[in-house]
């Protein structure tokens, strides 16, 4: 039986990323990292086609060498789901324990939405998938119902990120919002209409229905540039659309790491990441958001308190290493398949 294991990632690997080392300590086995950077393919129909293509082709490459691996951890959910897709489609013998991370799903309307749901159900219920990690407690029951499977198939773990080091995080007086998944930027613009607050939105697939003098939308702001924009904002806004969809956790942790106050929609997926006094969490009510933003801009003590308590919470519970250790405990306790 092989004791070689692999992690499938879709981002540019940094030297300090320690999941492989943490998994090696927990399992007593060798771990390697296989990378296919797909998070760069955004912003145009052609880029989206390339990204989708690699979501299927890279897992197929892994399938061809699957007998090398005792355990597979898919950081990019579609790398893991499509590994299971190919194995099920080709009726291959199961030889690897598969953990799928960073899972998120929202049902879409219409013919394509139904087709996507059938594809996701086929993958999620595949016998080649051993567990799927989601980042809020409520999702386990929601996803189990959506895909007609048992809740135990889904494992809840809290997200974590590496601390963001920025020596200069001066406040330049604008609201910053970023992210694609489940965002309700139209609501945020309704909040800002008629106010003097300036706002910068970093999102490659959002265009306002009408121009706003106080709102700038950046379609090509990613990675370090996005973090730089966040580092100089007054506060970070996370307006979310569907209360049942897990989203916004990464941005809230980035803001807390930088010591920026957060205002966000009151949704279930965020509640696992905040405590009283660490963020302004309110329903999507225009008047309530306007009042909260006004206070964040005019009450310095309040803004500093929210930012400071959020930063302390991040350091104590949401570091990247803490997340890696949570993943390692789940994977190390898994049943593995011989051949």
Region locations from a protein language model:
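Membrane-proximal helix-turn-helix segments that form the acceptor-binding/catalytic region
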Residues: 60-68, 92, 111-132
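Conserved acidic donor-binding segment of nucleotide-sugar-dependent glycosyltransferases
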Residues: 276-287, 294-301, 316
């Amino acid at each position: 039986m092989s004791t070689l294991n692999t992690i499938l990632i879709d981002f540019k690997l940094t030297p300090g990323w320690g999941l492989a080392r943490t998994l090696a300590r927990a399992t007593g086995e060798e771990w390697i990292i296989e990378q296919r950077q797909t998070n760069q393919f955004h912003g145009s129909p052609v880029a989206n086609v390339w990204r989708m293509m690699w979501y299927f082709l890279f897992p197929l490459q892994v399938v061809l060498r699957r007998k090398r691996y005792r355990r597979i951890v898919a950081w990019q959910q579609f790398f893991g789901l499509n590994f299971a897709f190919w194995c099920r489609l080709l009726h291959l013998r199961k030889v690897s324990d598969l953990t799928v991370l960073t899972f998120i799903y929202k049902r879409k309307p219409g013919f394509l939405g139904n087709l996507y749901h059938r594809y996701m159900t086929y993958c999620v219920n595949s016998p080649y998938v051993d567990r799927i990690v989601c980042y809020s407690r409520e999702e386990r029951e929601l996803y189990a119902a959506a895909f007609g499977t048992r809740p135990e198939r889904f494992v809840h773990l809290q997200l974590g990120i590496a601390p963001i080091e920025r020596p200069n995080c001066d406040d330049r007086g604008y609201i910053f919002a970023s992210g694609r998944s489940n965002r309700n930027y139209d609501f945020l613009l309704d909040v800002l209409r008629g106010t003097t607050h300036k706002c910068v939105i970093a999102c490659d697939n959002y265009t306002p229905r009408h121009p706003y003098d106080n709102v700038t939308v950046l379609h090509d702001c990613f990675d370090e540039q996005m973090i730089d924009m966040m580092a100089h904002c007054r506060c970070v806004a996370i307006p979310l659309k569907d209360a049942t969809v897990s989203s916004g956790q990464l941005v809230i942790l980035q803001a807390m790491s930088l010591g920026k106050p957060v205002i966000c929609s009151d949704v279930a997926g965020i509640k696992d990441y905040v405590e009283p006094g660490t963020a302004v969490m309110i329903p999507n009510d225009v008047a309530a958001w306007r009042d909260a933003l006004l206070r964040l801009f005019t009450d310095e003590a309040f803004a500093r308190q929210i930012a400071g308590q959020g930063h302390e919470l991040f350091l104590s519970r949401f570091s990247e290493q803490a997340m890696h250790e949570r993943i390692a405990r789940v994977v190390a306790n898994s049943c593995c398949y011989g051949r």
